[in-house]
Amino acid sequence: MRAFGLRLRSWTRLLTLGLASATLVAVGGHAQDQIRVASPDGRNRITVELRDGALFYSLQRDGRAVLLPSRLGFEFRGAPPLRDGLRVVDTTRSTVDQSWTQPWGEVARVRDHHNELRLSVAESAPPARRFAVVFRVFNDGVGFRYEFPEQPWLGDFAITEELTEFALADDARAWWIPSNRPRLDRSEMLYSSSPVSVLDSVQTPLTMETRDGRTFIVIHEANLVDYARMNLRGPRMENRTLGAALAPYADGIKVRGRTPFVTPWRTIQLADRATDLVPSVLGLNLNPPNVLPSTDWISPMKYVGIWWGMHIGTMTLSPGPKHGATTANAKRYIDFAAANGIGGVLVEGWNVGWDGDWIRNRNAFSFMQAYPDYDLGEVARYAHEKGVKLIVHNETSGGVENYERQMDSAFALYHSLGLDAVKSGYVTDLTSEGHSHWGQYMVRHYRKVIETAAKYGIMLDVHEPVHATGERRTYPNMMTREGARGQEYNAWGGEGGNPPEHETILFFTRLLAGPMDFTPGIFDILIERGTGRPRRPEEARVRTTLAKQLALYVVLYSPLQMAADLPENYEHQPAFQFIRDVPVDWDTTRVLEGKIGDYVVVARRERNGESWYVGAITDEEGRSFDVPLSFLSPGRRYVAEIYADGPGAHWLTNPLPVAISRRAVTAHSRLRLILAPGGGQAIRIRPAR
């Protein structure tokens, strides 16, 4: 971890010092001096000022206030706070305009164009501790962080509070999930919507829309390394000021460190329309470039797996008559994947440790020893023979010490068997020592797993994770993660499953942080195989139409994308052809229509290809859209393969009908999309042969 931090600081210094446009500006001694930096297009502007020795920043867009003056600083255990009696020593400015290529993603090319302001700050009186605040202002938002140089009076430290504020100028409408539930460090909850002024404590990304609808604001963080995750402490009717709320150690300390030290970036994404929020690259641009010597082994793919059967009760994780992770059953899934062009198979419940209360017995898991009815080596050999990747499952139940003891040996074993993908899990609220699931202790662990996996050539899909903060740029083997309420809640969720609006909110909230392993593709909407009968409306079940399940492959991005249903539920289903065809890696993404909580229409062009895919989803209301196909190449002829809600389709009463049709289209064509209540539409637009 220290080595990575040193590399990061070196990269930051080289970027700042190596630019020809860097200048040094002396700041006078006036207490109210304002220092400003704007985005390259001039629309976003940060203003920094001292008020009675305290440091504040504010944010404007098009001359209108987004954030009012908001405090910066820290409180420590065993040392005075670093918040008052400050002076600005100097400022440094620089500009960057460069582009880089993602090995995979929602877009292939990313432009990094920003103006940077670096303020060196010190206490006016002894011990005169020093720090810097670095602002980078982009056309799509702002990032800022603290940097602590090595110094005599600030060596080892323990942060009890980060005082960073976000003082909203408008009582904007927010879409949020809570962060203050006792012993509940998880993100698998339904979203609520309310004015900022009534928020308590919430998770990020926090997406907001100003009351006049002119600005969308998203607060999050980037490059979370060796620090605690940031949640937001709400105003509770007092005002509209949100404060950083760091996840704690068991003793209440938030962050332990030693100078030199840098914090994560605090990010504020800005857009005129909700549709402009996606694809979100602000956090990616605030992470260091890829450090892997080669990414040739990293391969986005679709996969099937022994997963949904355990949620609906047709299989079990633990050994017994319905054990899902048997050699024979794994081979059955591998055969299905090979026959249908599916890249991978996930097997859960293969390793010793699932007997009894596996959540409490977190140290019982072995990540190398299989149950007697599962031959890991033979399954790996068979998968390789069939051209299918075997995805290994590592559930920890939060026993991270047990996992770290075995990790090198386990990953070396997987590598020796030609296995290059792991799905990990952390089904727990606190660590075995009582630390927060999202605190510095766990952030260090998650980074150690990413780095160790990279060493052994392993891609990662992390469930129960800390939230994504753009680290996939630096370590592109960190493919996808859960971090929100996914499909499994449709099997057993207490509220009857995810409501039809859920995915239309995720697109504009959770997915702004990074890819999500939502696990779409359930065709047995009423879960007859798990129950023995169609489930009733009040019971847990999938609350979409079948066509919407197809559309989710385009709408909810993940480079590892599951076809989650049982293989037998896909047999003799013409609609399964869309899952066979749809890519998981994109060159271009365009959001055509969207309203948070209501609907999304998105078009994506496949990486290294000429086909486009359109996904449209709606909430409980039926909708129609007239979509121009001007994004297609002019002068080319295409065929649109359309998977629409069938006649009479309705998520509650008639979810299964799918109407499949084809029509010739060009860049001058328009498509009329008609979505049933809770429905969707999925379209493949390929060049005409």
Which role fits each region the language model picked out?
Residues 662-689:
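C-terminal beta-strand-rich structural cap/linker in extracellular carbohydrate-active enzymes
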Residues 596-638, 681-682:
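Carbohydrate-binding surface patches
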